[in-house]
Curated annotation (Swiss-Prot):
Gene that produces this protein: moaC
UniProt binding sites for substrate: M75, C76, H77, M111, E112
Taxonomic source organism: Methanocorpusculum labreanum (strain ATCC 43576 / DSM 4855 / Z)
Broad EC category: lyase
Function: Catalyzes the conversion of (8S)-3',8-cyclo-7,8-dihydroguanosine 5'-triphosphate to cyclic pyranopterin monophosphate (cPMP).
Protein name: Probable cyclic pyranopterin monophosphate synthase
Catalytic activity from the UniProt record: (8S)-3',8-cyclo-7,8-dihydroguanosine 5'-triphosphate = cyclic pyranopterin phosphate + diphosphate
InterPro entries named among the record's database cross-references: Mo_CF_biosynth-C_arc, MoaC, MoaC_sf, Mopterin_CF_biosynth-C_dom
Active site feature: D126
E.C. code: 4.6.1.17
Length: 158
């Protein structure tokens, strides 16, 4: 049976005490995709979106989200964010977002990477939603999926 560290011996939710753990370098990378209409993808690539530079805005939004993860996820520890790198790869069907986060601390930083990639993708959607809607106001093509942690690195204590 799996162990859920956020439940105490009375099966009550609590924030895990990480104070006895040593500080070590940590890194996590997450990715996810947003599927868009070909015309929208072309407009993004050619800088023709009226709201501005979609990918630059998504990078900023993702970075801000990384720094606020502790305030959004109840049992997530506030961590000193040492660095955030967000980048995108575009195909003729989707944009794939990547978010790498680094820290030096007592617990992993994968929730921050997942939050960063998620908000980057949501920001892309928000900036192009007017072009993605059909006549009925629905989004027949637009979807976000495949959000996952693709790498997690934990250093060793000194």
């Amino acid at each position: 049976m799996p162990v859920f560290t956020h439940l105490n011996e009375n099966n009550e939710v609590h924030m895990v005490d990480v104070t006895p753990k040593p500080d070590v370098s940590r890194e996590a990378t997450a990715k996810g995709r947003i599927y868009l209409r070909p015309e929208t993808l072309a407009a993004i690539a050619e800088g023709r979106v009226l709201k501005g530079n979609v990918l630059a805005t998504a990078q900023v939004a993702g970075t801000l989200a990384v720094k606020q993860t502790w305030a959004l996820i109840p049992m997530c520890h506030p961590l000193p964010v040492g660095g955030v790198t967000i980048w995108f790869e575009q195909t003729d069907e989707y944009i794939e977002a990547f978010c790498r986060v680094k820290t030096y601390g007592k617990t992993g930083i994968e929730m921050e990477a997942l939050t960063g990639v998620s908000l980057s993708l949501l920001t892309i959607w928000d900036m192009v939603k007017s072009a993605e809607k059909d006549e009925a106001g629905q989004y027949p093509v637009t979807r976000i999926d495949g959000i996952s942690v693709i790498e997690k690195i934990k250093g060793t204590p000194e």
